[in-house]
Design a protein with these regions (language model features):
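Feature captures the FAD/FMN-dependent oxidoreductase FAD-binding
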Residues: 12-63, 155-167, 192-194, 199-202
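A conserved FAD-binding loop/helix module that cradles the flavin
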Residues: 107, 238-265
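Rossmann-like dinucleotide-binding cores of NAD(P)H-dependent redox enzymes
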Residues: 1-17, 26-28, 108-155
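FAD-site-proximal beta/loop scaffold in flavoenzymes
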Residues: 66-92, 176-243
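Generic beta-strand/beta-sheet core signal
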Residues: 29, 50-52, 73, 98-100, ...
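Short amphipathic alpha-helical segments
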Residues: 60-64, 108-110, 133-134, 205-209, ...
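Glycine-rich dinucleotide-binding loop and its adjacent helix/turn
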Residues: 7, 16-31, 57-114, 214-228
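Long hydrophobic segments that form regular secondary structure
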Residues: 91-125, 178-181, 186-192, 225, ...
Length: 265
């Protein structure tokens, strides 16, 4: 969650309150698939709930994508969230964000609030097709973010290993309603480019363990949030239960907890 949306350690205070109710043991630095395996958890506990989110990000599919100055929006938002002082963070002067979801909006607005001179959010389709809510789109523009629709990234420009700009091709829909490039190119200067074109389930989380059924890049669950593995439930962004929003993840957790209770009582 972007730092400007939840101030004063709101989420941490919520966690602290719940943990203090008692009967909860917290183990940190235990990465699923590395320090701890799903198969081992299934042997040790009657029920396992996976709320692992989507830890990987989609690639732009461009050459030199590993250039300095080309970052994952999700990773950057996480770093900002954990930073003790946002005032000490450096931010680029000219920033281009690629994507049309709430994550793209978050990093664009956050960059502007941190002092970036020029922030442009780009999306390959129109505003109606953006997964970001209309409220979020309007908020970005009132925050000083420029939004450019109907452009798709084609190539990155660099100097001495650092991104200096990005080439876009204008897009349109063909008579069948499919997206296509028009051949018209546009160049945008940038010293920072953020990728926000969707997240993926991280394969390594199931390393060395039986893998639950996965469809469309997400863990498959039934109406009770049960996975294909006995004794394993899942919820949040890692399953397709609705919108990829915090409130949806919280609701998934509540419903899964009730399901686990019914199964074990």
């Amino acid at each position: 969650i972007a730092a400007y949306k939840t101030v004063n350690n709101f989420a941490q205070r919520e966690v602290d309150f719940i943990v203090k109710t008692g009967g909860i043991e917290t183990r940190t630095n235990q990465r699923l698939g590395q320090e701890v395996k799903l198969d081992d958890l299934r042997k040790e506990y009657d029920a396992v709930f996976l709320s692992i989110g989507l830890g990987d990000v989609n690639s732009l599919g461009l050459e030199d994508e590993e250039l300095n100055g080309v970052y994952s929006a999700v990773d950057t938002i996480s770093e900002l969230r954990q930073s003790e002082s946002l005032k000490e963070l450096s931010v680029g002067r000219r920033i281009v964000v690629i994507g049309g979801g709430n994550t793209a909006i978050d990093i664009a607005v956050q960059s502007k609030k941190l002092g970036a001179e020029d922030v442009t959010l780009t999306y390959r389709r129109g505003p109606e097709q953006m997964s970001a809510t209309w409220k979020e789109q309007e908020f970005a523009q009132t925050s000083g973010v420029r939004v450019k629709h109907w452009v798709a990234p084609k190539s990155l420009h660099s100097e001495n290993g650092h991104v200096t700009g990005i080439e876009f091709e204008c897009t349109e829909l063909n008579p069948e309603g499919k997206l296509r490039g028009t051949g018209e190119l546009r160049h945008m200067e940038a010293d920072v480019v953020f990728k926000a074109i969707g997240q993926l389930l991280e394969d390594s989380v199931f390393s060395g363990s039986e893998i639950p059924a996965i469809e469309g890049g997400k863990i498959t669950v039934n109406l009770e949030f049960e996975t294909s593995l006995s004794g394993v439930w899942a919820g949040g962004d890692c399953v397709d239960s609705g919108e990829d929003l915090t409130v949806q993840s919280v609701e998934d957790g509540k419903q899964a907890a009730l399901s686990i209770h019914r199964r074990l009582k």
